[in-house]
């Protein structure tokens, strides 16, 4: 993460990284997704949220520590970040699975979703990596946010939140070709603009937290997944302080 990128993330609360996925990765991820659409998504559904992605195959497991993204997370969150939760959203037309309302923001303070900057270093709570598996054009809809709102000291006006019919001028559209990753802090006021593109919007969301924090009420069990690297197992740990002299991984009190 270079100095220009640090400046932009501090200024706006997000970065857009093109080519975060290779053409081969995009193809493999989409091929797997197609199979799950057939199994889980009815033809008439305009939107659908998929979970349990780490069970979809190695192509999804590899995103745990994507080398194109990890260096950014190490600066934005810290070297001992953990995977908090993941899902994938399909939108064929209209609003997302959770609608078109903006959420998040610097105020009121949320100990799980925050942005701070001290002594030349940024500190973030829950942080999102959103991968485009299909092209998103400037007029298609998709990710929208209020740049700089992660540092706001005033509540976002309630009457500006709903983007279903009108988009307030303070909201920016963030778009990019397939393979683009948008990295943003959950302290940023953001949401999904109604989808009007010709094809489907396919977005994978990998959400990370500092090692000692959890936003999600559930944790990954690293033992449920085969073939994980040692680094991936570490990223799937439940929240804990990770003292440097520990002799074992976290375990339940009854173990």
Where are these regions (language model features)?
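A structural signal for short, well-ordered beta-strand segments
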Residues: 86-88, 129-131, 204-208
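Double-stranded beta-helix
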Residues: 123-126, 135-193, 213
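Short, surface-exposed loop/helix-turn segments at secondary-structure junctions
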Residues: 102-114, 158-168, 219-223
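Histidine-centered catalytic micro-motifs
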Residues: 99-107, 146, 189-192, 206
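Non-heme Fe(II)/2-oxoglutarate
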Residues: 181, 188-189, 193-255
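Residues immediately flanking
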Residues: 104, 133, 185-186, 208
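Short acidic/polar capping segments at secondary-structure boundaries
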Residues: 88-95, 106-107, 132-138, 149-152
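Non-heme Fe(II)-dependent double-stranded beta-helix
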Residues: 1-120
